[in-house]
Amino acid sequence: MQVLHLDSSILGDASASRILTAAIVDELRRDNPGATVIHRDLAVEAIPHLDGAIAAGFRATGADGFDAVTLAEHARSEALVGELLASDVIVVGAPMYNFSVPSQLKAWIDRVAQAGRTFKYTETGPVGLTGGKKVIVASTRGGMYSAGPTAAMDFQEAYLKTVFGFLGITDVQFVRAERLAMGPDARAQALEAAHAAMHDVVNQAIAA
């Protein structure tokens, strides 16, 4: 088993999503001692946001017309796609920032969502090319967005489920911790509940 571990929180050791992704990966390793893990810290080693020259590398067949910096970004894009395609389980740390995901995580998504590599266009519509993988998302929020009037503000989990589904990955599970900014007791309770839920999610990922 190969695990791709993505962190995107800017909060370092204070990050709840990092606590959860580390716990998820540890449990995957315990149950699969031979597993290999690739860790990408998208906040510490940020991926430059997509621009025209970088996107052109998705279709390029040579070095003509590109400078050294752009060619390095083309190589980075290829490495990121290769890691995704080679992995069996993707563990994503995705805190909610302003109702969506961190821009650092979006930058990774923009690099790996490549026509002809991770999805393709057909006469009947797009088809994902990365099926058979499993995604476990550590979803963290300062408030409550899974239910009630604020549920309509959630452009985090729905977006991730949609984009991974577009790439062909339909097995997307969430380990959620909410109300993290509502005091120490609420934070502790949320993390405890998330850790409890994590065991079932990991077991499902391994068993399926």
Swiss-Prot record:
Top class in the EC scheme: oxidoreductase
Alphabetical list of SUPFAM superfamilies matching this protein: Flavoproteins
InterPro entries recorded: Flavodoxin_fold, Flavoprotein-like_sf, FMN-dep_NADH:Q_OxRdtase_AzoR1, NADH:quinone_OxRdtase_FMN_depd
Cofactor note: Binds 1 FMN per subunit.
Cofactor: FMN
Enzymatic reactions: 2 a quinone + NADH + H(+) = 2 a 1,4-benzosemiquinone + NAD(+); N,N-dimethyl-1,4-phenylenediamine + anthranilate + 2 NAD(+) = 2-(4-dimethylaminophenyl)diazenylbenzoate + 2 NADH + 2 H(+)
Binding site for FMN: 9, 15-17, 96-99, 140-143
Keywords for the protein's UniProt record, in alphabetical order: Flavoprotein, FMN, NAD, Oxidoreductase, Plasmid
EC number: 1.6.5.-, 1.7.1.17
Alphabetical list of PANTHER family matching this protein: FMN-DEPENDENT NADH-AZOREDUCTASE 1, FMN-DEPENDENT NADH:QUINONE OXIDOREDUCTASE
Function as written in the Swiss-Prot or TrEMBL entry: Quinone reductase that provides resistance to thiol-specific stress caused by electrophilic quinones. Also exhibits azoreductase activity. Catalyzes the reductive cleavage of the azo bond in aromatic azo compounds to the corresponding amines.
Name recorded for this polypeptide: FMN-dependent NADH:quinone oxidoreductase
Source organism: Ralstonia nicotianae (strain ATCC BAA-1114 / GMI1000) (Ralstonia solanacearum)
